Structures are given as C-alpha cells and as structure tokens.
C-alpha cells in the first residue's frame, strides 16, 4: 500500500481487518443467543474476531446469515472436510454462516493466494465481490509482507470467479458490485465474459483507488476502458473514502469519508463524473454522523441504514453487544431513514428525505439489513446477527 504512516494508523484503527494482530477478546462464557426487547441476538463465530460483516442478500438460499472474514480462530460448525478448522490463518476464507453457527457457504484461498479482503454481498443475491491478495518472492508465494490485490466476483452457485483486476488494487479498495436483479446466472454459459458470467451486461462496479477517489465502472457502457472517477466532497480532499455501496437501482453510492478515527461524515452521490456529493446531515438527536451507511429496500421503499456511536468514539464496535448493560444505546445505536432518489436531476432534486431518522436497534449494527427486513448484521469484536422483533 502506498500510504504514509499516519494515515495507515487511522485506517487500522477504523477497519481493524488490516491489523496483523487479532483483537484478544476477554475470555467469557459465550452466549449463543439472547432475547430482549430489541429482538434476538446471535453470536457469529463465538467471541472470536471477525471483520467485513455483510448481511445475506439471498434470503432464500442463505436466510438468517451473514458473510464475514476470519482471523486465526474459528467457532463454527464446518459443513465438510474442505472447511478446515486447524491451521487457520488470517482471511484465508470467505464464510457465510447462520444464527445456529452453521457454515452455509465458503470459499478458501487457492494455493497461489495469501488472503481475501473487503468481501461484500452484491446487490444481487447470487454474487459476492472481494479483494484477493498475494505476493511472490523468487517465484514462490510469500505472504509475510506487503501484498498485491485484485478485485473479483464470485458466483455463489458454483464458486467460480470473474476477475475485474488481477493486481495493482489498493488493499483498502472496499469494492461493491451492482447486478441487475432480473439476471439469472447460468453456470453452463461461458464465464469468460461479463454477460456470460452474470447473465447480463447490466453490471456496475465501484471501488476506492490508490489516490483515494471512487472509481465507477459500467459494463454496459464501455466497461473498464471507460472507468470514471467521482468528485470528492468539497473541502475533504485529504479525507479518506470508505466503502462506497451502490444503491439498488444502480445509480447512486452511499459512503463515509473520515479525517481521523473519531471524525467522519457520510455522503450520497450519483454515479456520474459531474455529480456533487450530498452530505447526510447530522440532525438533532443523532449521537454522531452516520457510520457505515447501507442501502435497504423494502416493498418499493428505499432507506439508508447507519450506525451511530457516542461522542469521542471510533467508528468501530468493540463492545460485547450481548451484555445487557450496553443495550441501552451507550455503545451506539442503529438508525434508518427513508428517502427518494432521482437520477439525472439537479443536486437539490437528486434526493429527498421522506421522514425523520428513527432508531431500529439500541446497539450499533454496521453490516446492513437483510432484504426481508428481519436481520441486522455487525462485526468486529465480536460479531452478531440481530433478529428484529
């Protein structure tokens, strides 16, 4: 990574997944599940550290589940011998597990790969997007130092991969993928083209570049050769961008920018070179600016979901949310607000709020809400799925 040391420290504090030293959770008796007024809370991977929580976007095949990355310890129920429980190394697999701790889907690194990074469920339940890192020394795989990252998509049905870039991508690219929801993946079709792999050419990719700008690729309109960069928010040229997530209609992104571990903002922006980022304002009653914003669509209604944290806190959860003492909002909360988006409109008409923000959980959940509205997901230390009442 081409980062100066100070910015690297900021990134490590925020993301946790980039640290080579796993967080050591206090040794306590693991509560498998707990029911309270806010719903039923389930541990994911016991009390072990996870990162990059992403709630299942396929409630038919992977209900009550989330996608996550591991460190060097696992507390899940392996589905077969391929999911090894010994010799586990940091980010050596992608895991989808459910509220019972059962692994429902997984993908291991290949022999010429070191680790995965930044996995995220796409807007289409049949695909995941992720980074893969590797490095070679004297012709042999070398995972001990800096890695070279690429971006690829995984088709859930057969675990085949489609490479967008196989190298020279930032470790902090946080890619996201939009695929037309009507696409029906055909595992017998050619997987060497976008249309063959995804079942459509209506595919869009976003990621953060080395020079810290959002890159937007529309495969129905020029693909990688016509990739575009979005303008950064005014006055925030030196702030870092984190996790641009594409809206369900494929026309907008929502994301964070941060100056330091305790100072961040959230923006909505149309996927256009000339678009103006629109800040999600902090209004009365909010604990902080929105953290880890996600889209949520339900029966034709569109929402932005985000976490809030107490003053002087980092955008990172280290609390055991199963502890009733923090289920009063003292560790943060989860908020949702309905809005309407209008592409190809002046910035003052591009979106409008339908109602005020409302709390949906008195704990901070940073991994999104399932399409059926029943579950929220979060990591990092530890991770949880919350079934809402």
What would you call each of these model-derived segments?
Residues 6-10:
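Sec-dependent N-terminal signal peptides
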Residues 11-12, 53:
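Alpha-helical and His/Cys-centered functional microenvironments
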Residues 20-389:
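Sequence signature of WD/YWTD-type beta-propeller architectures
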Residues 1-4:
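Positively charged n-region of N-terminal signal peptides that target proteins for export
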Residues 14-16:
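C-terminal motif of bacterial Sec signal peptides marking the signal peptidase cleavage site
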